[in-house]
């Protein structure tokens, strides 16, 4: 009898402890505890789910508003005015997370100062065969070869038009929307693909991105060559200028980190010559640093995350110098902390983006980056984030 009572009490205790643990974990999930997400929840999810399934679920949960809202309140010192718009804070989500414009509002609630969707291609396409996304947890990195999988312009246009008035209010409130454009795999005239993207989605964007730097579409990076780039961007600008909208979107070009010195000079020359509004620096890299530890490090595709950080920052530094600081730069590649963000800003970026860090640290990383950035700005004597833009070039 005594044994049965003891066993029953033990079972009751386990239920109470288990239920309490579940409630506590639920509380930490809902409140967006940074350490809980980075050290327990995200690693556990990665053990359970393959990378692409995890990505799809993350987009779905974000679209349904099932992820924690940010608790960080943006201060005035984080505000940036660039590309013809106010940005409440300089930390955005890079293209690649919300490829089809399904989760825009949820991403703003996560605390991002701007959202960039895409890449969007004119016609729907499946992209490359699976598996096409690979984690390198030892390196805090991802290799992907998605290959511009896209729902196509028509579907994305319909999706964005349904929330057009909502976006207009968000933009006015300092939360702009960017749309990243790509070309179809089988297209023979890339310029026509990008021009069509401008015609269809330009009226719905605060800025457009001409993505000529993905390593996962054959021949795409050749569009970064001087003559090809000039021809392409001339056509894109003509289409943008012809849009019948009150506020025409800015046009930015997203470039690769794997460029020669001559490539960078040529891009800077064309951008300045044509009056391109900005650069996004950089896309993922095809290089594989010797420091990589992940078992899947040799998989083909673009490498993003921590191993890209310094290469991206150096490319920002060079492009800022080549454009004399007159072309706004969005810095992306390996941002997972306020220190990473500030290094890119000091190198010349007006805004920064992250993505891979979100897969390893979860939604709380957004508030963490902003909080750390604000503290570092104060520590280094900057009254506003805009005072830090290009600071390394003024030493």
From Swiss-Prot:
Binding annotation for substrate: 99, 144-148, 211-216, 283-284
Parts of the chain on the Mitochondrial matrix side: 1-10
Biological pathway: Pyrimidine metabolism; UMP biosynthesis via de novo pathway; orotate from (S)-dihydroorotate (quinone route): step 1/1
Pfam families for this protein: DHO_dh
Family: Belongs to the dihydroorotate dehydrogenase family. Type 2 subfamily.
Active site positions: 214
Class of this enzyme: oxidoreductase
Cited CDD domains: DHOD_2_like
Gene coding for it: DHODH
Activity response to pH changes: Optimum pH is 8.0.
UniProt key word Transport: no
PTM annotation, UniProt: The uncleaved transit peptide is required for mitochondrial targeting and proper membrane integration.
Membrane topology, as annotated: Single-pass membrane protein
Protein's recorded name: Dihydroorotate dehydrogenase (quinone), mitochondrial
Transmembrane segments: 11-30
Keyword terms: Flavoprotein, FMN, Membrane, Mitochondrion, Mitochondrion inner membrane, Oxidoreductase, Pyrimidine biosynthesis, Transit peptide, Transmembrane, Transmembrane helix
Organism: Bos taurus (Bovine)
Residues holding FMN: 95-99, 119, 180, 211, 254, 282, 305, 334, 355-356
Compartment(s) of residence: Mitochondrion inner membrane
Gene3D superfamilies in the record: Aldolase class I (3.20.20.70)
Interval spanned by the transit peptide: 1-10
